[in-house]
Amino acid sequence: MNHSLYLVAGLGKTGLSIARYLKRNNKSFVVFDTRKEAPGLAEFQNEFPDVPIYLQQTPDEVISQVTDVITSPGLALDTPVLESARQAGALIYGDIECLAREISAPVIAITGTNGKSTVTTLVGEMAKAAGFRVAVAGNIGTPVLDMLDDEHHYDLWVLELSSFQLDLTYSLSPVVATILNVTPDHLDRHHTMEAYTQAKQRIYRGAKAVLFNREDVYTVPHQSCQADIKCISFGKDAPSMGNWGLIEQENTIYLAKGMERLLPVESILIKGVHNWMNALAACALAEAAGISMQHILNVLKTFPGLPHRCQWVREVDGVGWINDSKGTNIGATISAINGIGGSMQGKIVLIAGGQGKGADFQELAQPVSEFVRSIVLIGEDADKIESALAKVVPVVRASSLEGAVTIAKTCAKPGDVVLLSPACASLDMFRDFNHRGDVFTSSVRGL
């Protein structure tokens, strides 16, 4: 029998979970990381003192022996070590592929540029309310392979999947899969919208039912739905039979399935049109997986939303403050501006900026001109945002987020909302988007 040697590519939380999985399965493996100071290195060496670790490069004689590379999604597929392993005949896949090969319980698979975590968490809560033993994992929370120890405890997996994870997954057969929306993101990695969309579309392969956004052509399955695959859609308009949407009656907007009104939107806690879409998607996914409508609607009425995602902070002198630090790309910020601006009388003072990931900030011009009073900019790509939007609304610069909060307070009028929705990644100034949101929230609480 051929001896298999696995290469774990990338340390960090995912890499550690892959190493534990391989050890449980008595597999031989070595570890590689592109960074000299790999995160989790000390913890790894403590747990696996005898496993060879290669930092920054892996010797050719090791690569030539590798049969399988299990890589963290953060590592680009054109990284030289992965290229060398591929040319030497190794199979390359990720932790979600390992999970797919191991489990028999049904999977709900969720991707999209924005709203993934909200929808994944919502569906998980609906499943829990219905009495399912549910694992909520993937691009959210605990790495999936760390949950495999307890696989026999789960009757359902709800997986949030990024485009990077989907690029590395081949065997997943979800009971229902969705792409919520696709707007430009990660183009520094995928290079083109076509490649990014292609990665997202992989989620539909092998799915028994697919849910797509009928207002977003990128989410429509490329393979037209075969007879044995159920196709469901959601959108802002009134839905046809079996699909999901909004119905307005006597000045009240309802979430609806077909002609059936399910719930007035004011009775759900997550606010803004984009969150109504998230709620519809969660309802459709949960129902497709066999969860009763009673449990679905009960959870919708009580779900408070996730931190750093259009999260209400407080009101000061008639001005509302909202933390949308998770708005790390243009699509998320457009959703937040349209969703919040469309449901209020005043204007938005927008705090934005950070690392733009190659995005075109001109796309913000239309919603900004409609709903935004002024913009306060921070971070690495402030110049690019200013040159795209300075002719649309007044733009001010701040050297820190705390400074931006102080400036925004002077720009806002009673009835306005100050919205932190950066349209950028946070790593130029912060540990991550959570850290950025926490700094904003504590600054606002100090006003």
From Swiss-Prot:
It is found in: Cytoplasm. It catalyses: UDP-N-acetyl-alpha-D-muramoyl-L-alanine + D-glutamate + ATP = UDP-N-acetyl-alpha-D-muramoyl-L-alanyl-D-glutamate + ADP + phosphate + H(+). Signal peptide: none annotated. InterPro entries: Mur-like_cat_sf, Mur_ligase_C, Mur_ligase_C_dom_sf, Mur_ligase_cen, MurD. SUPFAM superfamilies: MurCD N-terminal domain, MurD-like peptide ligases, catalytic domain, MurD-like peptide ligases, peptide-binding domain. Pathway: Cell wall biogenesis; peptidoglycan biosynthesis. Belongs to the MurCDEF family. This is UDP-N-acetylmuramoylalanine--D-glutamate ligase. It comes from Legionella pneumophila (strain Lens). The gene is murD.
